[in-house]
Amino acid sequence: MIHHAAPDFWSSYRSLPSEIQSVADRAFALLKADSRPPSLHFKKVDNFWSVRVGIHHRALGIDIMGGVLWFWIGTHAEYDRLIG
């Protein structure tokens, strides 16, 4: 599975504190190396793909041909509002 990041993802990413950006970098490196690492809770939530970025953050993506397009990353509270 190939992972791509949309411009909106990078906008959300840049608004995160640098320590969370580092956690996100490690999470996505792990995701690219292992398509379903248990620690990331990579799963389908309705029409979205969800991945854990540390304890308090999540990222959302959508299916595209051959992979996932990640469009958002932020706090778990924001995530709950988006998928709620």
Report residues per predicted region:
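A short alpha-helix capping/helix-coil boundary motif
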Residues: 5-6, 38
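Short alpha-helical scaffold segments that flank and stabilize functional sites
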Residues: 8, 27-30, 64
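Enriched for short, Lys/Arg-rich terminal
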Residues: 2-4, 11, 15, 22, ...
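Residues in soluble alpha-helical coiled-coils and helical-bundle/repeat scaffolds
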Residues: 15-18, 36
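A short, surface-exposed loop/turn module that caps and links secondary-structure elements
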Residues: 27-53
